[in-house]
């Protein structure tokens, strides 16, 4: 267990990681995820408004998260841009960059688009095996999750 006061990484605060908690739980994978996230944020050159990052099991259940959510290990983040709806083409660009960054550090990424913003995550080994060790993406803007909707992202 690590205690933070303030930022846990450049551009990201402890309050964004786990709001309302003075205790921060991090796993080895969390640190790798933060490295990827910092690289993505530097590339994006815009503030990412964090909706959700680390969640306890109880918090995850309250928001309807799946039991295997990467938020439980701090390896997923939900975010949006201020006063901007992310387009399909922007999302695809984000996916390509996120996949590249994750590969550079030896992990496999995932991304989802929603009406409120974007989910970026790192697949755990079980998820990666199930997903054929490929970048996984989805579109939930309709209110129903559509898996792998963009053919041009199949081989990133």
Regions found by a protein language model. Name each.
Residues 63-79:
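Active-site microenvironments of hydrolase-like enzyme catalytic domains
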Residues 38-64:
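Extended, low-complexity, intrinsically disordered C-terminal regulatory tails
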Residues 48, 67, 106-109:
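Secondary-structure boundary/capping signal
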Residues 48, 77, 118:
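A broad, low-specificity signal marking well-ordered, structured residues that form hydrophobic/aromatic
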